[in-house]
Amino acid sequence: MAPKRKSGVSKCETKCTKACPRPAPVPKLLIKGGMEVLDLVTGPDSVTEIEAFLNPRMGQPPTPESLTEGGQYYGWSRGINLATSDTWIPRNNTLPTWSMAKSSFPCLNEDLTCDTLQMWEAVSVKTEVVGSGSLLDVHGFNKTHRFSKHKGNSTPVEGSQYHVFAGGGEPLDLQGLVTDARTKYKEEGVVTIKTITKKDMVNKDQVLNPISKAKLDKDGMYPVEIWHPDPAKNENTRYFGNYTGGTTAPPVLQFTNTLTTVLLDENGVGPLCKGEGLYLSCVDIMGWRVTRNYVSSLEKGFPRYFKITLRKRWVKNPYPMASLISSLFNNMLPQVQGQPMEGENTQVEEVRVYDGTEPVPGDPDMTRYVDRFGKTKTVFPGN
């Protein structure tokens, strides 16, 4: 009998005793800034860049331009004087304010009734403070150096420095917080906490008061010492900043055209430009200089340059036709101001809603209603 050939199966082979683990599924839809984010748009026109700059708003407006009638202070605040009481009213031209602007883009969607729309998404930004070399000017009519009475160089710009820049698809959300709530700011020319809340500031405004919030919707109107970026909001905006304090702190500033700041979040999605617009804002304070006669100090601000890269992205249409038609009809009606029919002071006594039909009840005095849980309740009349 011929010998049998051995099986070709190796005895060392081990079978998998259990199924191999599979990668956990991840969500494909992402809601960002109130939008359901979908895929990226590909093609030659799907990426664009925009360059812009913002000038500082230190208190002195751009006009008048005459260098003898106030124009010489453009880029500076006017003279800051020490308060004479706890209820000091600072002048508006001594308050550095936020710089902001909106850059508009061409319309991407001709048909707003589609299920999906295209939006610009901010991907990255290159930004730089311009003009730091001007701080080398030490021959101006400023405070003299402490080691030279009326000879040699003057004291350069020094003191507290504050740098913040932001970019996104919506105006920057701000949180109000002040050092002393007893300070009385002027009600015209600037936006204060009282402008928003319609009330005087309280002790909570020296910490975090949830009602003292605003949106940066005006250039040169929101004082830096009052309004700060709100970390609880700004979901569709990115902001970056740093602060260096001190009365004689030397200005420290780095600048380069090779540094890129990525605006994407942990999910790879950047700020979505709603309404075909990109909002930019910044504050760049380099310190202050003291005048020759020691009368006052002037804070110095610098402009900032932006170069933003944007790409197109598909999002689910957040504006259904029903809401568009409803808003159209509502806007056609005249706007009236009548007595309150909703809210705390409502004058509505009773509302009845009927659904379907039922037999006539035997006792018309029985009260029937639907509670907040959707259950039908019957209250029997008392004796």
Swiss-Prot record:
Residues 321-383 are annotated as: C-terminal arm. It holds the Pfam family Polyoma_coat. It comes from Murine polyomavirus (strain A2) (MPyV). One of its GO terms (biological process) is virion attachment to host cell. Keywords: Capsid protein, Caveolin-mediated endocytosis of virus by host, Disulfide bond, Host nucleus, Host-virus interaction, Late protein, Phosphoprotein, T=7 icosahedral capsid protein, Viral attachment to host cell, Viral penetration into host cytoplasm, Virion, Virus endocytosis by host, Virus entry into host cell. InterPro entries: Capsid_VP1_Polyomavir, dsDNA_vir_gr_I_capsid, Polyomavir_VP1_sf. A DNA-binding domain overlapping a bipartite nuclear localization signal is present in the N-terminal region of the protein and is required for efficient virus formation. The intrinsically disordered C-terminal arm interacts with neighboring pentamers. The unstructured nature of this region allows to make different interactions depending on the structural context: pentamers present at the 12 icosahedral fivefold axes bind five pentamers, whereas pentamers present at the 60 icosahedral six-fold axes interact with six pentamers. Forms an icosahedral capsid with a T=7 symmetry and a 40 nm diameter. The capsid is composed of 72 pentamers linked to each other by disulfide bonds and associated with VP2 or VP3 proteins. Interacts with terminal alpha(2,3)-linked sialic acids on the cell surface to provide virion attachment to target cell. Once attached, the virion is internalized by caveolin-mediated endocytosis and traffics to the endoplasmic reticulum. Inside the endoplasmic reticulum, the protein folding machinery isomerizes VP1 interpentamer disulfide bonds, thereby triggering initial uncoating. A motif (Bipartite nuclear localization signal) lies at residues 4-18. This is Major capsid protein VP1. GO terms for cellular component: host cell nucleus; T=7 icosahedral viral capsid. The modification Phosphothreonine is found at residue 357. Homomultimer; disulfide-linked. The virus capsid is composed of 72 icosahedral units, each one composed of five disulfide-linked copies of VP1. Interacts with minor capsid proteins VP2 and VP3. The keyword Coiled coil does not apply.
